[in-house]
């Protein structure tokens, strides 16, 4: 049976990928963001959902979002990035620079619900990952409110923003994405997901690590970078 990770297990799996298996952060981020773009493309074809607002947070989840936006642009989408609190580290600065040089639009103010409905077909939620602890910081209140109030479909990267990594949706969080892309392995909160599509992405987990944590990940078909659970 597929294992759903608690917060400490998710952290430890990441640490082992970095320390024992010598993956770099940017290496895993590139693979994760690419798999997210592929999952989005499977569920929301560019011919119908070309205009994508990618909302990026300050950590690794936001980095995944920046990578996803770049690959979506290469797949025929027209992404725009909302990145309210850029991380002042070379990795994130380089990812943002790559998006800029790819001529991906970056917006400085969070759109209101009506503006988003007029301007976009889909929102990618890459705000917070499995290390999130409430409450939501002031810089992100407006975008979390947009995610909770919009009628646009939402694709959440690894964890729907504002959810508890283990308990799922909290009392003050109404976010219910249409697509959840669990990275590496699903987290416990994914058991509470009621949206239409749940995908697994991040095809980089070594067999020995799978066995150690008894992840029981399903086999990815052929050369696919993501699979629907």
Swiss-Prot record:
GO MF entry, a single one = NAD(P)HX epimerase activity
Keyword Transport appears in the UniProt entry: no
Q: Enzyme group, top EC level?
A: isomerase
| Protein EC | 5.1.99.6
- Give all residue intervals belonging to the YjeF N-terminal domain: 10-217
Q: Which Pfam families match?
A: YjeF_N (PF03853)
Q: Does the keyword Isomerase apply?
A: yes
Q: Which PANTHER family match?
A: NAD(P)H-HYDRATE EPIMERASE
Job of this protein: Catalyzes the epimerization of the S- and R-forms of NAD(P)HX, a damaged form of NAD(P)H that is a result of enzymatic or heat-dependent hydration. This is a prerequisite for the S-specific NAD(P)H-hydrate dehydratase to allow the repair of both epimers of NAD(P)HX.
Query: According to its UniProt record, which protein family does this protein belong to?
Result: Belongs to the NnrE/AIBP family.
Instruction: State the name under which the record lists this protein.
Output: NAD(P)H-hydrate epimerase
Tell me the organism. Answer: Drosophila virilis
């Amino acid at each position: 049976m597929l294992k759903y990770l608690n917060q400490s297990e998710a952290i430890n799996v990441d640490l082992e990928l970095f320390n024992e298996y010598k993956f770099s952060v940017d290496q895993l981020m590139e693979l994760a963001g690419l798999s997210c773009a592929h999952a989005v493309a499977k569920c929301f074809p560019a011919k119908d959902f070309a205009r994508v607002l990618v909302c990026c947070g300050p950590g690794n989840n936001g980095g995944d979002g920046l990578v996803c936006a770049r690959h979506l642009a290469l797949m025929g989408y027209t992404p725009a990035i909302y990145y309210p609190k850029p991380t002042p580290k070379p990795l994130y600065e380089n990812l943002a620079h790559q998006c800029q040089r790819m001529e991906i639009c970056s917006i400085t103010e969070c759109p209101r619900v009506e503006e988003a409905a007029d301007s976009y077909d889909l929102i990618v939620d890459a705000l917070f990952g499995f290390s999130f602890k409430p409450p939501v910081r002031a810089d992100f209140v407006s975008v979390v409110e947009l995610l909770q109030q919009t009628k646009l479909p939402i694709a959440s990267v690894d964890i729907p923003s504002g959810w508890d990594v283990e308990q799922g949706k909290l009392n003050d969080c109404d976010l219910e994405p249409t697509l959840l892309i669990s990275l590496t392995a699903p987290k416990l909160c994914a058991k509470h997901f009621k949206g239409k599509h749940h995908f697994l992405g991040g095809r980089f987990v070594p067999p020995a690590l799978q066995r150690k944590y008894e992840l029981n990940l399903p086999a990815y078909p052929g050369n696919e970078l993501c699979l629907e659970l």
